Curated annotation (Swiss-Prot):
Residues 108-110 are annotated as: Interaction with target base in tRNA. The gene is mnmA. Catalyzes the 2-thiolation of uridine at the wobble position (U34) of tRNA, leading to the formation of s(2)U34. HAMAP family: tRNA_thiouridyl_MnmA. The record marks 138, 354 as: Interaction with tRNA. It catalyses: S-sulfanyl-L-cysteinyl-[protein] + uridine(34) in tRNA + AH2 + ATP = 2-thiouridine(34) in tRNA + L-cysteinyl-[protein] + A + AMP + diphosphate + H(+). This is tRNA-specific 2-thiouridylase MnmA. The lineage of its organism: Bacteria, Pseudomonadati, Pseudomonadota, Gammaproteobacteria, Legionellales. Keywords: ATP-binding, Cytoplasm, Disulfide bond, Nucleotide-binding, RNA-binding, Transferase, tRNA processing, tRNA-binding. Residues 159-161 are annotated as: Interaction with tRNA. The active site is at residues 113, 209. Its EC number is 2.8.1.13.
Length: 371
């Protein structure tokens, strides 16, 4: 059994080694920094600014997050450096998301941010400051088996974030640490409260990071030109108008404004598909409508965490959403960048642009983008 990189069995570092911690101002990264500090490592904090915003923006929490990060760094007794990656974030994450939205897909910016910003730009910056590793407050584990690194699920199945880390490579895992991967979220909050952290009860961040709590439609309108169009049934019957298909995702119920039709039952309507060429939103009625379910998908942009990819066909588990239970499937290789995934049971609301992530037991193998 290899070395698992979390608090109950940290890597065999020299205690005078410098470990940088990505301090977000949240409770998870704060406790991660505390754990490392109390194990005798020299810890430095790094706060990322990934989005340029007006300080008066009521929806942006960056100013408060930085204030919290400074307070925690002072409380623990570590230095804190502020680094601005807004240009890199725009080029490698946000622009990609805009392109995907414009094509009617639903991207996952957290996945790209982890690969391109946190575990690339931030890791590189940490190295320049003399750190040997970058630590974050992610709920996941890293295992070293004969210098091959495996990404494992967190001990807290409800908070596991391996789904969002599936694009990391061997170098990134070898130079990263997840100090709270062995904890339950409740334990992390209890530690923070016991130590008097001001953020011990701070709400977890949710949604798309650069949008914050503002309305998704209002934000996207600032960057993309919306084209209103028809809402149709699969049979082609026009039953309403949409504001722009980029605002909707498969499985969505809210915001359609087509309920209470005299020619339909009382069951709610759900988005089942988006016809980008015709600019048409296709909807069906009822949560269990058969067209909302599919037993297969194809994916592209394949990435395998280990240097040697698995043999195909591969029977394993998969997730098409981060909080979904593992689903049994068979993966068949189509070419170097595409594969076919056949599920044992039909899956609801498979969404183009989202990630499908593969698992064998607790190990995250990698994944791809649903096509």
């Amino acid at each position: 059994m290899g070395i698992i990189f979390y608090t109950t069995q940290m890597p065999n570092f020299e205690q005078n080694q410098v470990i940088a911690v990505g301090l977000s101002g949240g409770v998870d990264s704060s406790v991660a920094a505390l754990v490392l500090k109390e194990k005798g490592y020299e810890v430095i904090g790094l706060f990322m600014q990934n989005w340029e915003t007006d300080s008066k923006d009521p929806f942006c929490t960056a100013e408060q997050d930085l204030s919290d990060a400074k307070a925690i760094a002072d409380h623990i007794g570590i230095p804190l450096y502020v680094v601005n990656f807004s240009k890199a974030y725009w080029n490698h994450v946000f622009q990609h998301c805009l392109d995907e939205f414009a094509q009617g897909r639903t991207p996952n910016p957290d996945v790209w941010c982890n690969r391109e910003i946190k575990f690339k730009s931030l890791l590189d910056h940490a190295k320049k400051l003399g750190a040997t590793h970058l630590a974050t407050g992610h709920y996941a584990c890293i295992q070293n088996e004969n210098n091959e690194y495996r990404l494992l699920k967190s001990n807290d199945s409800h908070k596991d974030q391996s789904y969002f880390l599936h694009l990391l490579n061997q170098y990134q895992l070898a130079n990263s640490v997840f100090p709270i991967g062995g904890y339950q979220k409740s334990e992390v909050r209890a530690i923070a409260k016991k130590r008097g952290f001001i953020n011990h009860a701070k709400k977890d961040s949710t949604g798309i990071c650069f949008i914050g709590e503002r309305k998704f439609k209002d934000f996207l309108n600032e960057f993309l030109l919306a084209q209103p169009g028809n809402i149709e049934t699969p049979e082609g019957k026009i039953i309403g108008k949409h504001d722009g298909i980029m605002f909707y995702t498969v499985g969505q119920r809210k915001g359609l404004h087509i309920g209470g039709r005299p020619d339909a039952g009382e069951a709610p309507w759900y988005v089942v598909d988006k016809d980008v060429k015709r600019n048409v939103l296709i909807v069906v009625q009822g949560y269990e409508h058969p067209l909302l379910y599919s037993q297969e998908l194809t994916c592209t942009n394949l990435h395998w965490i280990r240097d040697t990819e698995p043999s195909f066909p591969l029977t394993c588990k998969a997730k098409t959403r981060c909080r979904q239970a593992d689903q049994t499937c068979v993966i068949t290789r189509l070419d170097n960048d595409h594969c076919h995934v056949q599920f044992e049971h039909p899956q609801r609301a498979i969404t183009r642009g989202q990630s499908v992530v593969f698992y064998l037991g607790n190990e995250c193998l990698g994944g791809g983008i649903i096509n």
